[in-house]
């Protein structure tokens, strides 16, 4: 594969914080299996970032490692799902994909003194902005119930729990898909890039589901994978991608990640319920930043990515 084809797929693999073209290819196949619209959106987001990243102060190394493209890929996916079809919505999606890159650069520079990576912060910010601004524009509509008249958090423990589906949906929901086969393929894709990432993913997912079930999480939410996908990202970030920059003991960092991420998701979901916007990957961001700050040495290595 040429360098640009490698980059195209790395833009997708970097969503799970792994730099591997074959991982990106297998993930893309998983997306098409789960929902063709998501597969197509991921491709469009990756292509647009390929064509425009050089205009937003990215180095060739950053572009070809996929660091410029993973937020555009995520934004293309979620806005394709959240916005109702119209030419105005298409324009908003395209603008948002491009905006992800300068916003990512701004956040990266803002975080440099703290030696923290921007992660998926641009994705979260832009999605929230678009969902909230849709209330002020007649021709930009969303299927998300923004600013509901009432906010009610209902926990149902009587629904049948489907552990296998929930387990792999925890993984597939990274890309906003609830699909067992897609989740299996994404796990395999992670193993291709890093055996450690694959093993950590499986163990953390199992422990996370046990913890969430023990605490009495809503069974429907567990089945859909909404409680677990942030943990999948956090465990790869802390246990693999930024492992060398974190001076916490590996076992302690692992346990803290497994415990903190579901707690952060539950708190964030409740906090945002009255506003009506999804928590997205915000729990992953908060957990990862917290543990990276907790594990920083005094040598000031630059881990910003």
What is each model feature region?
Residues 26-32, 64, 74-82, 185-189, ...:
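Generic transmembrane alpha-helix signature in multi-pass membrane proteins
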């Amino acid at each position: 594969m040429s360098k640009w084809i490698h980059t195209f797929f790395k833009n997708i693999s970097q969503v799970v914080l792994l730099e591997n073209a074959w991982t990106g290819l297998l993930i893309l196949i998983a997306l098409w299996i789960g929902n063709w619209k998501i597969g197509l959106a991921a491709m469009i987001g990756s292509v647009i970032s390929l064509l425009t990243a050089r205009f937003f102060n990215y180095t060739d190394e950053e572009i070809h490692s996929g660091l410029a493209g993973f937020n555009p890929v995520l934004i293309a996916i979620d806005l394709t799902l959240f916005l109702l079809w119209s030419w105005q919505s298409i324009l908003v999606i395209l603008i948002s994909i491009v905006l992800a890159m300068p916003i990512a650069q701004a956040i990266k520079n803002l975080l440099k003194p703290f030696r923290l990576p921007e992660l998926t912060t641009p994705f979260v910010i832009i999605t929230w902005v678009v969902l909230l601004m849709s209330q002020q524009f007649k021709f930009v509509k969303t299927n998300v119930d923004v600013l509901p008249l009432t906010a009610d958090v209902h926990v149902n423990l009587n629904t049948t729990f489907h552990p296998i589906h929930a387990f792999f949906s925890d993984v597939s929901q990274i890309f906003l898909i609830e699909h067992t086969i897609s989740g299996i393929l994404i796990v395999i894709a992670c193993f291709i890039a890093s055996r450690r990432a694959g093993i950590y993913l499986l163990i953390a997912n199992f422990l996370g589901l046990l913890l969430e079930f023990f605490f009495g999480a809503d069974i429907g939410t567990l089945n859909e994978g909404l409680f677990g996908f942030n943990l999948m990202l956090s465990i790869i970030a802390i246990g693999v991608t930024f492992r060398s920059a974190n001076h916490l003991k590996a076992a302690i960092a692992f346990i803290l990640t497994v415990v903190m991420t579901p707690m952060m998701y539950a708190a964030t979901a409740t906090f945002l319920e009255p506003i009506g916007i999804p928590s997205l990957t915000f729990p992953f961001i908060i957990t990862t930043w917290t543990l990276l700050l907790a594990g920083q040495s005094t040598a000031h290595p630059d881990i910003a990515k």
